[in-house]
């Protein structure tokens, strides 16, 4: 096993996980995703269910933005504190602007880092459900991602609205899972569909908070931060 102390992606020995009702989709990550398979995953999301899928950083658990049931299942699966908010996966900046207010600085940063391994914490619009709002420091904020991964982007585009998302971190662990077999092993009983899209880098996104013209690095991750604060 490769552990967190080594700095490598957290994995577990391979083991087949046969879970009744769990759908597994194999999608090649280095080409245009199969429209038929993406449609199958989106059908599950439209039903308010939870999908595990790859991103440009780690594997994630996601549901449609309006699915309260899906949201609650993600929190239960990870045993997350309700104060830890989920992020939104958007297919592009145009879609993201419906859910977050972009100042000139935020727009310049977003143009620079998206699509890519970054999360931007921005003021939320009224399109974001209250359940998802981070009220830290009395601000209405939301995390926005536009990942550089064909499967994640295809899901968000086909769904027609953002994916509510959280990294696939097993309860009690600090690192997110990078391999689909591990995701199936740990979360197979908590999700309805797992997309096997190959391994991911296994490092979290870089999180940037932008308030007016001020940019702060909340978490250094896979995305480089050199020059970001000078944007």
Enumerate the predicted regions with their spans.
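N-terminal amphipathic/basic-hydrophobic helices that include classical n-h-c signal peptides
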Residues: 1-19
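Active-site-adjacent structural elements in enzyme catalytic cores
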Residues: 13-231
